[in-house]
């Protein structure tokens, strides 16, 4: 039987951990990729490693990027405060072109691995309004992937899978629980401390807490 491989973007947060579990349940051999991109919440990298071990991925790779050299986001520029109340429009926690960059590197690894599926945990229901989390972006990137690669041109098409795209945060939590995700291993907070404890105030913390509450599941998040 031919091995079915997938490259999965794993941040270490709730959504991406759920996606790994979903892909594994579908019979994929999972290869996870995380990024040390200068984010202020580097505790998520430790969380990603924990999740990868717990879910038994084949290989977990961490790629170094200096997106903090570009700046323009509260997640990569310490001079920009992380908002603690909801605002209008695209928030300052948006990292310019982040998912485009991440998916491009995942695409390169997928081509080397001869994997045809790339999974990303973006969501367009309970989310912060980032433009690179929308279905239109995912569809456009898939078209580009099949135009810009040797494998794509030779007819071995890539699929960009975003299984959480139309799910509420509560539905995501329920899907993960059904597949054995240990959410105590994950970190979602934009300004988590070195031990992975959360602030409980940022947009990501609010979405996470609301998701557990709506799902009727005890929230294992630790706060500072």
Swiss-Prot record:
ATP binds at residues 10-20. The keyword Metal-binding applies. InterPro entries: QueC (IPR018317), Rossmann-like_a/b/a_fold (IPR014729). One of its GO terms (biological process) is queuosine biosynthetic process. Pfam families: QueC. Pathway: Purine metabolism; 7-cyano-7-deazaguanine biosynthesis. Binds 1 zinc ion per subunit. It catalyses: 7-carboxy-7-deazaguanine + NH4(+) + ATP = 7-cyano-7-deazaguanine + ADP + phosphate + H2O + H(+). It is an enzyme of class 6 (ligase). One of its GO terms (molecular function) is ligase activity, forming carbon-nitrogen bonds. Gene3D superfamilies: HUPs. Zn(2+) binds at residues 189, 199, 202, 205. Its EC number is 6.3.4.20. The keyword Ribonucleoprotein does not apply. SUPFAM superfamilies: Adenine nucleotide alpha hydrolases-like (SSF52402). Keywords: ATP-binding, Ligase, Metal-binding, Nucleotide-binding, Queuosine biosynthesis, Zinc. Its cofactor is Zn(2+). NCBIfam families: 7-cyano-7-deazaguanine synthase QueC. HAMAP family: QueC (MF_01633). Catalyzes the ATP-dependent conversion of 7-carboxy-7-deazaguanine (CDG) to 7-cyano-7-deazaguanine (preQ(0)). Belongs to the QueC family. This is 7-cyano-7-deazaguanine synthase. It comes from Pseudomonas putida (strain W619).
């Amino acid at each position: 039987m031919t091995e079915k491989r997938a490259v999965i973007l794993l941040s270490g947060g709730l959504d991406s951990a759920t996606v790994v579990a979903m892909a594994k349940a579908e019979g994929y051999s999972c290869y996870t990729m995380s990024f040390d991109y200068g984010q202020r919440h580097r505790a998520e990298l430790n969380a990603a490693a924990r999740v990868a071990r717990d879910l038994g991925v084949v290989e977990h790779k961490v790629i170094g990027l200096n997106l903090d050299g570009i700046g323009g986001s509260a997640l990569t520029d310490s001079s920009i405060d992380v908002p603690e109340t909801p605002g209008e429009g695209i928030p300052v926690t948006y990292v310019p072109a982040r998912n485009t960059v991440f998916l491009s590197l995942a695409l390169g690894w997928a081509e080397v691995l001869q994997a045809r599926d790339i999974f990303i945990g973006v969501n367009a229901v309970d989310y912060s309004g980032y433009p690179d989390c929308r279905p239109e972006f995912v569809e456009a990137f898939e078209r580009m992937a099949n135009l810009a690669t040797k494998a794509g041109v030779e007819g071995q098409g890539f699929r960009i899978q975003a299984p959480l795209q139309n799910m509420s945060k509560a539905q995501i939590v329920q899907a993960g629980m059904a597949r054995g995700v240990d959410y105590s291993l994950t970190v979602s907070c934009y300004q988590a401390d070195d031990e992975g404890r959360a602030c409980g105030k940022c947009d990501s913390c609010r979405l996470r807490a609301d998701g557990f509450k709506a799902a009727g599941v005890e929230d294992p998040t630790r706060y500072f």
